[in-house]
């Protein structure tokens, strides 16, 4: 392991080691994330489903040698779920830290996936952490935790899912350094599929070409297009011995739509590429 000194903060660089999560850089996102961490700035990642947002955060946590606490946000996720709560047991009552509090105490990364799904009261907790104060107030214990230099708050969401009822308020969004992700260009996506699915370049190219054809059908009754994740699933199934048509039905057509006619239309595209 080697260390790169950055303004008195040492960054342990572990990228490329056998257990490093694979990530294919597409631009300057690694440098931007690293500089944001160096300056104590939170990061907002927005992009469609399955484009690599979570894998990127895992990759950067490994690269920076930081503990990573990932929270999959949902409608019932409250501030108490993030901060912690009192529990009652045989030995009495005790306080249990939530994932956000643990990340602050340990100086790690707290990653809130699909943050707009969480309840509105979470913003009250996140705002002091996401501005110059970098503080977490635990109302139930009276603690005010000052985030150490290593702590970083990272959130993500899919802009395509936003509506009038669920969206990130400008007062929250403007506290973050924002990064926009999308599906990779052809050559990079082929490398990703080949690496993740452990298939040869020819099959990866064929699957990616199919995925791009399906993405052009976005306006045809599809809520979401074929993600890189689904292309990887498809390639893995084909590698394991499933026929291409069966793999594409199970890993692409059916996950993309519940409507039988739409599924049939998607399979027509599959037949063109895997006749």
From Swiss-Prot:
Membrane-traversing stretches: none
Cell compartments where the protein resides: Cytoplasm
Molecular function GO labels: ATP binding; ATP hydrolysis activity; DNA binding
DNA-binding region: 249-268
InterPro entries: ATPase_dyneun-rel_AAA, CbbQ/NirQ/NorQ/GpvN, CbbQ_C, P-loop_NTPase
Signal peptide: none
The entry's keywords: Activator, ATP-binding, Cytoplasm, DNA-binding, Nucleotide-binding, Transcription, Transcription regulation
Entry annotated with the keyword Nucleotide-binding: yes
Residues bound to ATP: 47-54, 107-114
Induction entry: Under denitrifying conditions.
Its job: Activator of nitrite and nitric oxide reductases.
Record family assignment: Belongs to the CbbQ/NirQ/NorQ/GpvN family.
Name of this protein: Denitrification regulatory protein NirQ
Lineage: Bacteria, Pseudomonadati, Pseudomonadota, Gammaproteobacteria, Pseudomonadales
């Amino acid at each position: 392991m080697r260390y790169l000194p950055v303004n008195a903060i040492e960054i342990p660089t572990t990228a490329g080691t056998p257990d490093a999560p694979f990530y294919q850089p597409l631009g300057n996102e690694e440098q931007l994330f690293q500089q944001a961490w160096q300056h104590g700035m939170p990061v907002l990642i927005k992009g469609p489903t399955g484009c690599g947002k979570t894998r990127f955060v895992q990759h950067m946590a490994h690269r920076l040698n930081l503990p990573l606490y990932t929270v999959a946000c949902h409608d019932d996720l409250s501030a108490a779920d993030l901060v912690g709560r009192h529990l009652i047991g045989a030995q009495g009552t005790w306080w249990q830290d939530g994932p956000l509090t643990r990340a602050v105490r340990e100086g790690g990364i707290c990653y809130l996936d699909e943050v707009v799904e969480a309840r509105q009261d979470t913003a009250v907790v996140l705002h002091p952490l996401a501005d110059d104060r970098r503080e977490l107030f635990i109302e139930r214990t009276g603690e005010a935790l000052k985030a150490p230099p290593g702590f970083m708050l990272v959130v993500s969401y899919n802009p395509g899912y936003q509506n009038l009822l669920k969206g990130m308020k400008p007062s929250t969004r403007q506290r973050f350094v924002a990064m926009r992700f999308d599906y990779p260009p052809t050559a990079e996506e082929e490398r990703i599929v080949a690496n993740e699915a452990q298939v040869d370049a020819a099959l990866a190219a064929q699957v990616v070409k199919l995925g791009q054809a399906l993405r052009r059908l976005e306006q045809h009754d599809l809520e979401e297009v074929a993600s890189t994740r689904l292309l990887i699933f498809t390639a893995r199934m084909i590698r394991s011995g499933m026929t291409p048509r069966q793999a594409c039905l199970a890993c692409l057509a059916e996950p993309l739509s519940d409507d039988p006619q739409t599924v049939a239309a998607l399979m027509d595209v599959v037949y063109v590429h895997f006749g």
